[in-house]
Curated annotation (Swiss-Prot):
Renumbered residue ranges of the record's region Disordered: 75-100
The protein's name: UPF0229 protein CPE1333
Database matches in InterPro entries: Spore_YhbH (IPR014230), UPF0229 (IPR006698), vWFA_dom_sf (IPR036465)
Family: Belongs to the UPF0229 family.
Composition skew (Basic and acidic residues), residue ranges: 80-94
Entry-linked HAMAP family: UPF0229
UniProt xrefs under CDD domains: vWFA (cd00198)
NCBIfam families found in the cross-reference section: spore_yhbH
Gene3D superfamilies associated with the record: von Willebrand factor, type A domain
Amino acid sequence: MAIFRDQAENHVEHDRSIEDRRRHRQLVEKSIKENLGDILSEESIIGETKNKKYKIPIRGIKEYQFIYGANNKGVTTGTGEERRGDRISSDKRKAISNNKAGNQEGKDIYETEITLEELMDYIVEDLDLPNLDRKKYSEIIVESAAKKRGYQKYGVRPRLAKKKTVMCKIARKQGKKRALREIGEEAEIGRFPFREDDLRYYKVKKHPKKESNAVMIFIMDVSGSMDNTKKYLARSFFFVLSRFIRRKYNNVAFEFISHTTTAKNVNEYEFFHKGESGGTYISSGINAAIDLIKEKYNPGVWNIYPFYASDGDNWSEDNEKAMEAVNEISDLSNMFGYIELLPSTYSTTMFYRFKKEISKENFVSVTVKEKKDLWNAIKYMLSEELQEKNKE
């Protein structure tokens, strides 16, 4: 028996346009997430302002309609595991095939724009930083900004509540007028200066706040073998990583180290914009990070996450020193990440030796062989599953 429902009482809940708008938002978000890798590998986002806009292609939504099939024999059925938008038809017709004209209608494609700030929102949603291990003081107590909590009669001049002070003076003046009227005097009150009793100061209270106690150490090979493409990929990796962490945590320290055969601590601007040339001693950059940790960041107190980016091309006499340095910094860190960029030959780079000889559970290595691999490398380094794997 057919069942009919009267939807006239509530048009809003059954408004077809609401479902269309919801579906549209889903497609927009899906397209943005699918194109994150293209933006990171093709667009120069380093140093851009949060208002920089990027164009994202989005497939249009059509009204549901019945269409003629290909009139083929047989019936196509699903498996029961289909999702919305999946095609179960065996029809293989395409709008264009082998560079020849097709006979099918094309898809509506249009572009939407998002800012760098919005892009970072999607990156934050798509990634998850490995959970900071609990240290003795992994959550430090800091004082948040002081908040005003009423008034008091004493304090320092910068906290003088001018409006409240004037109101106290006016109240005192009005009180004097009332007193004069009560005794039958109507004398005009002349100059009426402020007195110490009129002054009011803001009463402030600071609230303790817990924040993560972590340091990120970025180490980058800037030697002659690191061409512009490799340096661009390395800087893109570090830029996205730094922006992501700063949005997720309030109290994270950053250190920047660049190296050739020698290493030096640099500021953030120099790290992302300044280039050098020369030979490569991988150990120099990692040892500089080790010295920095021993000098400023006690591993018993701090959560330490060094990340090192290089093309893996190392001077042969430094290979053993590099192995020792990686083992040592892994012992001092929660996780040490090694990113190898566009290696010329897999077996001749340090990635092969690190993978074979470094047995530390918290040592994580990835290779970026093409620009499109950058996004997967970032996700792999920062995935929550990776943290769980390291704890096993």
